């Protein structure tokens, strides 16, 4: 199977035409704009109609899609298990599983990166390949539409792919139908831009900024998506804003390592939020990788840390068990 990658750094972020995605662009929402169910998309409309009865109507949208919650009135009892309010990860609505914010295997880091695929990620992915390191990549649907070949590379390299919504907005701000669209159109674009070559359909997602409540969880659950959060935040995505400096980010990486060496993860592992957002976040990940590798017993994709050997809908693609990784037989 031939998969084309851009190796020339000067060409990596030059827009290109890729027929399988370009010819279907009219069947998706406008890239980087909040998604809604398209008026002519009878398949999406039928899917929404089939699940809307399971979505709570008593949980209302909160704030704006850019994260302004100033005018939100919300009970201190946190009735909706709203992560942005108090980092709740145990749903209060029956029938929903807890968010994944840690992993059961001791001494283990569920290794992953948000906001890809980044058009300039070849050096980063080359580095991961050189270390025989796989990770979980949380991909934005609009990015996949913009950079389909880069998305292909992740699957070809053996990384796990999860959904990170269509437009990367605060999910609890949307109506239920629009929140459905943010996830629904992300799953198909991952299929259509990647499945043509690799045939994978994700079964996991991460809400941008962690913004999720039981209404959004119910929508994700109805689409077969498991919610993955994190326990530690590198704040690499905030570097250079407010009081967050590159020194802050380095200190956050070091704190994670210190917690590992002090025994914090002796009974269960953890997940740290890091990003494929830009050259800084990827370079920082490479800078700290040797120290993470030395400190943690295992750095593995989140699916492997959860012993999930079938990370996709398709059953012809499988991951190793954690025990296989423990025996250095991962890949």
Where is each model-derived feature located?
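Terminal accessory/targeting
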Residues: 1-110, 131, 135, 267-331
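Short coil/turn segments at secondary-structure boundaries
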Residues: 123-126, 232-233, 286
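Alpha-helical scaffold elements lining the catalytic groove of polysaccharide deacetylases
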Residues: 156, 169-197, 211-267
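Active-site beta->alpha N-cap acidic-glycine motif
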Residues: 47, 52-173, 178, 182-203, ...
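Short, surface-exposed basic-aromatic patches at helix termini and helix-loop junctions that form
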Residues: 128-130, 152-156, 219-224, 289-294
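Residues at the C-termini of beta-strands that transition into short coil/loop
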Residues: 165, 231-233, 303-305
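Acidic-and-aromatic substrate-binding clefts and catalytic sites of carbohydrate-active enzymes
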Residues: 116-120, 139-148, 169-177, 205-214, ...
């Amino acid at each position: 199977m031939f998969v084309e990658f851009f190796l020339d750094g000067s060409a990596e972020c030059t827009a290109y035409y890729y027929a399988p995605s370009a010819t279907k662009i009219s069947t998706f929402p406008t890239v980087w704009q909040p998604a809604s169910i398209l008026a002519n998309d009878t398949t999406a409309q039928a899917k929404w109609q089939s699940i809307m009865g399971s979505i709570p109507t008593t949980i209302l949208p909160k704030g704006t899609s850019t994260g302004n919650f100033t005018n939100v009135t919300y009970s201190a009892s946190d009735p909706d298990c709203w992560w942005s309010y108090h980092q709740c990860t145990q749903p209060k609505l029956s029938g929903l599983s807890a968010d994944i914010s840690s992993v059961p295997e001791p001494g283990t880091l569920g290794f992953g990166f948000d906001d890809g695929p980044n058009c300039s990620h070849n050096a980063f992915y080359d580095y991961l390949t050189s270390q025989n390191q796989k990770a979980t990549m949380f991909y934005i649907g609009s990015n996949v539409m913009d950079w389909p070949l880069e998305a292909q590379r992740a699957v070809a390299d053996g990384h796990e792919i999860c959904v990170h919504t269509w437009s990367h907005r605060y999910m609890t701000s949307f109506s239920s139908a629009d929140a459905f669209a943010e996830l629904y159109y992300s799953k198909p674009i991952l299929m259509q831009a990647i499945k043509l070559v690799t045939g994978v359909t994700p079964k996991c997602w991460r809400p941008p900024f962690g913004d999720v409540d039981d209404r959004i969880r119910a929508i994700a659950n109805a689409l077969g998506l498991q919610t993955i959060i994190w326990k530690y935040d590198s704040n690499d995505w905030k570097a250079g804003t407010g009081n967050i400096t590159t020194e802050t980010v380095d200190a956050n990486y070091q704190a994670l390592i210190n917690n590992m060496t002090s025994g914090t993860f002796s009974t269960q592992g953890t997940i740290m939020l890091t990003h494929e957002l830009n050259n800084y976040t990827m370079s920082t990940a490479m800078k700290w990788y040797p120290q993470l590798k030395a400190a943690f017993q295992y750095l593995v994709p989140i699916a492997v840390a959860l012993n999930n050997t079938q990370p996709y809908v398709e059953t012809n693609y499988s991951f190793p068990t954690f025990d296989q990784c423990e025996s250095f037989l991962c890949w």
